[in-house]
Regions:
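A structural boundary/capping signal
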Residues: 1-143
Length: 143
C-alpha cells in the first residue's frame, strides 16, 4: 500500500534534480519529457517523472492526474510583478486515502490541494490523456 511517506520520498528525490527551462534545454518554449531522461527540466518534466515513479511503486493511473494552474502572484528578482501568463504551472495531483495531494517542484513536501492559492486551469481525467477545464472538472478521482 502506498503511503504519504512514499509520496514524500518521491517528491524529495525528484525535486533534487536540477531545474532548467525548456528554452535553455531545447531552445523551444515547451517540451515534455521525464526529467530523468533529460538530466534537468522544468515543472512538467518533474511531474512526469513523479507520475512514472509512482506507477512503478504500484499506484494506479486512476489515482493520478496532471493539472495546470496559475500560481500565486509574486514579484521577480527585480521587484516587478510577474504577469499572469508567466505564472502558468503544471503539478501532479495524487489521490491517497480520499485526500488529494499536490506534488509541486516548488515545494519540498506534498500539499493538500485545498491549501494552495492556485487558480486551477485544466485537469487531466485520471487514467486518460484527456483534459477538462477545471471549472467543469469532476474534482473527485473515483474508480
Amino acid at each position: 500500500m502506498i503511503t504519504l511517506n512514499d509520496l514524500r520520498i518521491i517528491q524529495t528525490k525528484v525535486n533534487l534534480l536540477p531545474y532548467k527551462s525548456d528554452a535553455e534545454n531545447f531552445g523551444t518554449p515547451e517540451f515534455w519529457a521525464r526529467i530523468s531522461e533529460l538530466g534537468s527540466g522544468d515543472c512538467d518534466d518533474y511531474e512526469l517523472e513523479k507520475y512514472h515513479r509512482l506507477i512503478l511503486i504500484g499506484m494506479k493511473p486512476s489515482q493520478l492526474r496532471l493539472a495546470t494552474c496559475f500560481v500565486e502572484e509574486h514579484r521577480d528578482s527585480e521587484g516587478q510583478w510577474v504577469p499572469k501568463k508567466d505564472r502558468y504551472h503544471l503539478v501532479l495531483l495524487v489521490d491517497l486515502n480520499g485526500i488529494t495531494y499536490v506534488l509541486d517542484n516548488r515545494y519540498p513536501h506534498p500539499m493538500e490541494w485545498e491549501l494552495l492559492p492556485y487558480e486551477w486551469h485544466k485537469l487531466q481525467i485520471p487514467g486518460t490523456q484527456t483534459w477538462e477545464w477545471a471549472a467543469n472538472a469532476d474534482r473527485s478521482f473515483g474508480e
